[in-house]
Amino acid sequence: MQHWKDFVSWADHLSQGKHRAYISMHSFSQMLISSYAVSYNEFPHEPFSIDQMNEAGKVITDAMTAVHGFKYEYGQSREILYPSAGTSKDYALEVFRIPLSWTWELRDTGKYGFILPPQHIVPNFEEVLAGMKALVGFINENYET
């Protein structure tokens, strides 16, 4: 974790505190999971940027789903997946104030699990690329650069 903190700190310094998005890529579930991951009992308030994460999440998942028809969902981890503690997205949001902080869970929804067949790799990349383009468009439209 220390190396990750050092890297994000260095990147934050280079960007002069203007990071807009943080993404931790994982498989599998086809979800964009935003902060917070911790349970409502432990952390009852909402993230400062929850409205922006939800708005961007819809734009991004719509773009990803449109590529090949594989449905992507978005929402807070504690609502659409399960509560968890110590996630990098929560740390990026709270410590570095990066407003759009997610875990992107890529293909699939369980049939293949973590062993995605080779024929799904390029289509999955195409979905991620569409999502990244949608994210950049959202940032350009909604944030000062």
Q: Can you annotate each of these PLM segments?
A:
Residues M1-T145:
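Metallocarboxypeptidase
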